[in-house]
Amino acid sequence: KRDGSPFLCLSDFIRPLSSGIPDTIGAFASSIDADMEGLYQQDPYKHLLVQTLSDRLAEAATEKMHEYVRKEAWGYAKDESLSMSDLLVEKYQGIRPAVGYPSLPDQSINFLLDELLDMKQIGITLTENGAMYPHASVCGLMFAHPASEYFSVGKIGEDQLEDYARRRGKRDRKSVV
């Protein structure tokens, strides 16, 4: 990077197996009822409102799930008491990057998460390219590391893409983006 800050990777926020110390990473998925997608098809304004509300509900479910993980399941923030404004600016420990966002842009990760989570149990199906249906669905990973932060992978070179595809066990580099 030009500003001298480090190049980050999500694996920076989880202990390597070679450390011999166990660590935890979480996987999540949330969605709204697929029937919401069909509401108000004849009224573009109301349909857009339903789509927007559906997206917000899926994100809110993820936020609530992350709070449960921080306070109870993993318990590293048992006494956390954040205001709504603190929640909105993510003043909590840990991150939950979603697939397709800047720190986890590879949409093919959805297939791995589907194998782990069996997302069809909550009504999520994947297209051949890994896009989720219903569209108001979100999945990703949870990290508790105190220094974890969101970042953007940014532009990568052909050599990096080929190396990534090889390490993912993919023959064609196009199958990982």
Each language-model region and where it sits:
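Small-residue-enriched alpha-helical segments and adjacent helix-cap loops
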Residues: 1-148, 159
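Residues within the alpha-helical elements of helix-turn-helix
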Residues: 167
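Short acidic alpha-helix initiation/capping motifs at coil-to-helix transition points
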Residues: 153-158
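Conserved small/polar residues in nucleotide/adenosyl-binding loops
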Residues: 174-177
